[in-house]
């Protein structure tokens, strides 16, 4: 795999492990120069949307999104750079680009990265691995079953606009020079 990412650091649907993303963010933070405030946000997601209509699939989409943002604040000047890659080499270039953008920005005397507030992060389980075990066919079956259930619920029903299934799996990480460090994986679905 390119970018120095091993297959072992990927989950079942091909997203990076959030701790791997956090390590990449930490590497960018470690390259901060004296006097710089640096913040890195990394994320990846896979989203699926299915619409059933008339007992068939009307539409089906599945999309993978990847994004990175690096912000540099130096001397009250804030620069941001973004990309759709999260490999270490690209992130190093993104830091340089954010520095360049900061040098060209106006001064904002209150510009700053977030600082830890001392409040413990709640221990919430926002991820269910079962989403990654469902095949596209399983998800289609759920949308079709929903439409069938609605239609059979009352004989007065003559039709529905559509029955939708959607899900997403998201991994993200954020770190900055003020000591913020967080990584998480979350999932969600709806019918």
Model feature map: region roles:
Residues 1-191:
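Active-site bordering "gate/hinge" segments
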